[in-house]
């Protein structure tokens, strides 16, 4: 895939507003296609997402962000799609997270508390060594959880429920961002395993 600079010069430059918005929609479709490919495999076996596919998703994300900046330079304002506005707000609010609750099969397995300089994780009522807050927040930012859907089920992918694992992630903020709840049964966001790896150390 081309660099951001090449994309801006060779693809973006000279396009009108309508063309740029259409380009953004095309990139979002490509991102969704890649994510769904990973998520379908995760239903059968939860694994870390392949690096090459993650890299492509990141590139499409960069193209979308640059396209929105280009719209702003042309128009002075951006007509955000609802899901994109939520994604932006979630990403900007990551430094203001105060707690994350994570559970599987309705058991409170993990509570993550954000102190001034560190993150305290309690798993099954046992506290693990604290983690540097800046490191943890940067890792959360890389997950782009604001792009996740609110609910994931096997039915989303044309499969019957396997009656397996249900999970829940609840994110609390100390700014004006509302509490966000993600849930799933037998299905997961494409980088869910990366999230689990982060909180398990």
Task: Mark where each language-model region is.
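Short, well-ordered, aromatic-rich surface patches in folded extracellular/luminal domains
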Residues: 41-106, 117, 124-135, 140-201
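Short, solvent-exposed coil/turn linker segments
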Residues: 8-11, 112-113, 144-147
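Short, charge/polar-rich alpha-helical segments
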Residues: 1-30
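Secondary-structure edge/capping motif, primarily at the C-terminal ends of alpha-helices
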Residues: 11, 31-34, 38-45
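Conserved beta-hairpin
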Residues: 110-115, 119
């Amino acid at each position: 895939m081309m660099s951001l600079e090449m994309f801006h010069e060779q693809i973006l430059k000279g396009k009108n507003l309508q063309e740029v918005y259409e380009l953004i929609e095309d990139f979002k479709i490509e991102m969704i296609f890649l994510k769904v490919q990973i998520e379908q495999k995760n239903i059968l076996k939860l694994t870390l997402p392949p690096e090459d596919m993650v890299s492509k998703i990141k590139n499409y994300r960069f193209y979308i962000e640059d396209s929105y900046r280009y719209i702003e330079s042309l128009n002075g304002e951006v007509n955000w799609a609802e899901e994109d506005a939520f994604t932006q707000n979630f990403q900007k609010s990551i430094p203001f997270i105060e707690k994350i609750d994570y559970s599987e099969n309705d058991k409170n397995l993990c509570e993550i508390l954000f102190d001034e300089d560190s993150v305290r994780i309690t798993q099954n009522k046992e506290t693990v060594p604290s983690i540097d807050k800046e490191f943890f927040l940067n890792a959360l930012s890389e997950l782009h959880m604001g792009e996740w859907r609110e609910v994931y089920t096997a039915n989303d992918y044309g499969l019957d429920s396997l009656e397996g694992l249900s999970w829940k992630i609840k994110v609390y903020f100390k700014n004006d961002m509302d509490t966000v709840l993600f849930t799933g049964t037998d299905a997961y966001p494409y980088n869910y395993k990366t999230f689990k790896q982060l909180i398990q150390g």
